[in-house]
Amino acid sequence: MSPGVKVALVPGVLALLPAYAGRIDPVAELRAACVEAVRWLGNDFAVVADPQGMRVVEALRRSLGLDGRSAVTGLSARPTAVLVVGNGSARRSEKAPGHLDERAVAYDSELEKALRGGDVEALRGLDRGLAAELMVGHVDGFARLAELLIPGAAAEVDYADDPFGVQYWVMRWSLPA
């Protein structure tokens, strides 16, 4: 029996870069969840990320003693491990980077429901225009995630919170081969 496919989701938040940690890490719990998700994937995994997300992936890999740039990008062959980088709205509160947009919490709630339950149709059908207005991080990553997931695949949720008014998730899926 061949091994299954591991898929993980982490946010592409710059606060995860070492330069932002400082003496007191503002995202210690999030960082720990992200590091564990990358460790769970193993040494070699494909990455679905925008340029900012790639910086975060490189930093997470280095924190584990791995070559920051050795992660494979793209999904040309069927990989056995994939890291997707993306996050929810950056407009969930008055102090959020994009300030408050009343639609943000509902949007993120529907996105989280789709992620938790492996609703690939909902992930494919995300409103990209609304996502842009709500400052969703790397919405294309969620569409790529839909290509990887098996419909109904439940996620293991390691982190789901909105510090600084931005929705972040760390989730993992173990899929059959």
Where does each model-flagged region fall?
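Active-site beta-strand/loop microenvironment that shapes enzyme catalytic pockets
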Residues: 73-110
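Short Gly/Thr/Asp-enriched flexible loops that form oxyanion-binding sites at enzyme active sites
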Residues: 52-61, 92-100
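Polyanion-binding loop/helix "lid" in catalytic or ligand-binding cores
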Residues: 115-156, 160-163
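A short aromatic-anchored loop/beta-hairpin motif
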Residues: 1-58, 64-68
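Short, basic/aromatic-enriched C-terminal tail that caps enzymatic domains
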Residues: 165-177
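Short, low-complexity, intrinsically disordered N-terminal peptides in bacterial proteins
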Residues: 1-6, 76, 174-177
